[in-house]
C-alpha cells in the first residue's frame, strides 16, 4: 500500500500572511512548505532580467523554454528558488517582482507550465502549499483548504513593516493602491482567478496577531486531518 500523504491548501490575496503562516504551520507539523508565489516570481524575474515585458504575453511565452526552475530545501526546511542554477530566493522578494508575478500568472500557458511541478510535490510529500488557486486548481482534492484574508489596509501595513525590515522602505499609500489593484487583477483574470473554494474554511486575520492567527489555522487543520 502506498503511503498516505496529506495536503493543505492555503489561498488568499496578496499580503494576507499566507507564506509566513504556512511556513510556521509546516514547521509545527513537520510538513514540506511550498510557496507557489515564489515560483511565479521566479518566472517574472527571469523575463524581466532578459529584457522582456511581463505584460506582453507573446514575450513571456517566447522565453518559457529557456527558463529552468528548481526548488531546494535547506536543513532548516526553507524553500530556495533556483533560476537556471542561480539562487534567486532574495532577489524575488524585491517589491517590483511582485508585479511581475501578477502579470505572468495571468497567462494560462505559464500556469500549465508550472502545474506538474507543484502537483508532484504533493504526490510525494506531506505538503502545505500556498498561493491563489491551490484549493481550486492545483490541488482540488486537498485534505484541508483554507482561504486566508485580511483587510487591504491591514495587509498594506504588514507589507510595509516587512519591507522596512529588509531595508526597502515604501510609501504606505502607494502600497495600498498596489494591493488594491492586484486584488482586482487576481480576482478578475481569466486563468484561475483568485476565489475561495466552496469547501474552504475562511480565516480573516485582520484583528489577529501572528500567534493567534497560527493557532486559528492549526485548529482548522486539526478538525480535518488526524494529526
What are these regions, as identified by a protein language model?
Residues 1-7:
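Extreme N-terminal, non-catalytic leader segments
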Residues 10:
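Hydrophobic anchor at the beta1->P-loop junction of P-loop NTPases
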Residues 14:
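The conserved Walker
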Residues 18:
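Conserved lysine of the Walker
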Residues 21:
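Hydrophobic positions on the alpha1 helix immediately C-terminal to the Walker A/P-loop
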Residues 27-93:
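N-terminal phosphate/diphosphate-binding loop that engages ATP/GTP or pyrophosphate donors
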Residues 73, 118-125, 132-137, 141, ...:
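Small-molecule kinase domains that catalyze NTP-dependent phosphoryl transfer to phosphate-bearing small molecules
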Residues 89-166:
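ATP-dependent NMP and nucleoside kinases share a basic, alpha-helical "lid"
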Amino acid at each position: 500500500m502506498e503511503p498516505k500523504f496529506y495536503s493543505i491548501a492555503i489561498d488568499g490575496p496578496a499580503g494576507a500572511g499566507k507564506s509566513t503562516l504556512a511556513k510556521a504551520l509546516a514547521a509545527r507539523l513537520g510538513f514540506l512548505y511550498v510557496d507557489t508565489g515564489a515560483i511565479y516570481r521566479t518566472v517574472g524575474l527571469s523575463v524581466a532580467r532578459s529584457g522582456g515585458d511581463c505584460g506582453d504575453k507573446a514575450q513571456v511565452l517566447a522565453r518559457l523554454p529557456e527558463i529552468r526552475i528548481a526548488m531546494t530545501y535547506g536543513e532548516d526546511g526553507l524553500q530556495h528558488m533556483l533560476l537556471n542554477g542561480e539562487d534567486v530566493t532574495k532577489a524575488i522578494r524585491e517589491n517590483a517582482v511582485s508585479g511581475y508575478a501578477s502579470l505572468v500568472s495571468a497567462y494560462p500557458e505559464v500556469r500549465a507550465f508550472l502545474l506538474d511541478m507543484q502537483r508532484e510535490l504533493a504526490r510525494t510529500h506531506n505538503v502545505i502549499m500556498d498561493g491563489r488557486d491551490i484549493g481550486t486548481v492545483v490541488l482540488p482534492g486537498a485534505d484541508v483548504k483554507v482561504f486566508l484574508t485580511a483587510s487591504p489596509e491591514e495587509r498594506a501595513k504588514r507589507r510595509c513593516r516587512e519591507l522596512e525590515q529588509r531595508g526597502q522602505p515604501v510609501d504606505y499609500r502607494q502600497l495600498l493602491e498596489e494591493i488594491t489593484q492586484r486584488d482586482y487583477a487576481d480576482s478578475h483574470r481569466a486563468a484561475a482567478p483568485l476565489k475561495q473554494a466552496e469547501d474552504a474554511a475562511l480565516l480573516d486575520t485582520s484583528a489577529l496577531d501572528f500567534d493567534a492567527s497560527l493557532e486559528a489555522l492549526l485548529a482548522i487543520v486539526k478538525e480535518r486531518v488526524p494529526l
